[in-house]
Curated annotation (Swiss-Prot):
Organism: Pelodictyon phaeoclathratiforme (strain DSM 5477 / BU-1)
A GO molecular-function annotation: NADH:ubiquinone reductase (non-electrogenic) activity
InterPro entries linked: NADH_Q_OxRdtase_suD, NDH1_su_D/H, NiFe-Hase_large
A family per Pfam: Complex1_49kDa
Ranges annotated as spanning the membrane: none
Protein family (similarity comment): Belongs to the complex I 49 kDa subunit family.
Keywords: Cell inner membrane, Cell membrane, Membrane, NAD, Quinone, Translocase, Transport
Protein name: NADH-quinone oxidoreductase subunit D
Job description of the protein: NDH-1 shuttles electrons from NADH, via FMN and iron-sulfur (Fe-S) centers, to quinones in the respiratory chain. The immediate electron acceptor for the enzyme in this species is believed to be a menaquinone. Couples the redox reaction to proton translocation (for every two electrons transferred, four hydrogen ions are translocated across the cytoplasmic membrane), and thus conserves the redox energy in a proton gradient.
Catalytic activity: a quinone + NADH + 5 H(+)(in) = a quinol + NAD(+) + 4 H(+)(out)
Length: 400
């Protein structure tokens, strides 16, 4: 228990019960106050506004306000041909564009019922897992900054630059790649690409452990995240959570394993979930640990893809790409495991047009953010920063 003397309020006793609920005992009652956080705030990771109802330092309710970055993605897709939508998907989760491209390409390929060359599938998985690691490095580095630790950010972005260099070598772009096309790839990878990727895997494996320890062995970071923003597994499932958020609550659910696609059924990897030894299952620290552990699993996947890679002899990355895409009438839904959770595309075709009748994106960030009210209730105002950072939102995908 901590006792504070606050001017105008009197004696205040702050206690935490079961590493979860903050209990405030006051000698004098306080009035409820509405506190607006954002949309211009460094801790909201974009143009997010939170309207918080507070009782002193305790949050009783928090409501997110969205739409500041809305770009009419879904409506715009109805006015362009299927291949032209790929660059639009890059701008959803712009920190994991390869993963977004893969999910959209899978949906249209399912609608067209076309088979993809195996080499294309393996290359797709490699670039997607590289992008997953790069995305988690941003999440881990910026989370440290949110809570006052600047050094891990520098190390994370140092290693992220190597990954962006590899992806730029393959696609020609640092970000927003337009590389995974419907039915194939824009280009085959350079001849020494897999060698360079293998060297990165060898280099980064010990670095991943080092980056994890920089924060988890920091007493201040652990105090700010352990037992904060706990989400029970059943509530997380009811909200429709996915990705590291759901796994952070102890649910072993990963689309690459539970609803496998591409060549993931041929690959051996684990789905990390917290064991409750370092963190309280479902708290901010658990979600951070899941992202840190996932980077090592991505390295395992990349290594296996390189070992199983079919030869490039006679390979044409565009061999399965239709010259004109006009799917038969119907509708499909395809989903993929993105760094922030399940990204799904629902596409409807009228059978006549080269443009989709409807293209709906299912955003994991939007679903995860919708639980802010439950995550923040009973927490202190400074803990709200830790909670937002643990969600790892990208507003480009939330607003679309």
């Amino acid at each position: 228990m901590q006792e504070l003397d606050i001017a105008g309020v009197g004696s205040v006793r702050v206690t935490r019960k079961n590493d979860n609920v903050v209990v405030i005992e006051k000698d004098l009652a306080t009035e409820q106050m509405i506190l607006a956080m954002g949309p211009q705030h460094p801790s909201t990771h974009g143009v997010l506004k939170l309207e918080c109802l507070t009782d002193g330092e305790v949050i009783t309710e928090a409501e997110p306000y969205l739409g500041y970055l809305h770009r009419c993605f879904e409506k715009s897709c109805e006015h362009v041909d299927y291949p032209a939508i790929v660059p639009y998907t890059d701008r959803l989760d712009y920190l994991a564009s390869m993963n977004s491209e893969q999910a959209y390409a899978m949906a249209v390929e399912k609608l067209l019922d076309i088979e993809i060359p195996r080499r294309v599938e393996f290359i797709r998985v490699i670039v997607a897992e590289l992008n997953r690691i790069a995305s988690h490095l941003v999440a881990i580095g910026t989370y440290g900054i949110d809570l006052g630790a600047f050094t891990p950010f520098l190390f994370c972005f140092r290693d992220r630059e190597i990954i962006l260099g590899l992806l730029e070598w393959a696609s020609g772009a640092r970000m927003l790649y337009n590389y995974i096309w419907i039915g194939g790839l824009a280009y085959d990878v350079p001849s020494d690409f897999f060698k360079r990727v293998g060297e990165f895997v060898t280099y980064f494996r010990p670095k991943a452990v080092e980056l994890c320890n920089l924060l988890t062995e920091n007493e201040i970071f652990v105090k700010r995240t352990r037992g904060i923003g706990i989400m029970p597994a059943d509530v997380a499932i009811n909200y429709g959570w996915s990705g590291p958020m759901l796994r952070g609550s102890g649910v072993k659910w990963d689309l690459r394993r539970n609803d496998p696609y591409s060549v993931y059924p041929e690959l051996d990897f684990s789905v990390p979930v917290p064991d409750g030894k370092v963190s309280v299952v479902g708290d901010c620290l658990s979600r951070h640990l899941v992202r840190a552990y996932e980077m090592d699993e991505s390295l395992k996947i990349i290594e296996q893809c390189i070992d199983k890679m079919p030869t490039a002899e006679g390979f044409n990355p565009r061999s399965a790409i239709p010259k004109r895409i006009r799917p038969k009438a119907g509708e499909v839904y395809a989903r993929a495991e993105n760094p922030r959770g399940e990204l799904g595309f629902y596409i409807m075709s009228d059978g006549k047009s080269t443009k989709p009748l409807r293209c709906k994106a299912r955003s994991s960030c939007f679903v995860n953010l919708s639980a802010m009210k439950d995550l923040s209730k009973g927490q202190l105002i400074p803990d709200l920063v830790a909670i937002i950072g643990s969600i790892d939102i990208v507003l480009g995908e939330v607003d679309r």
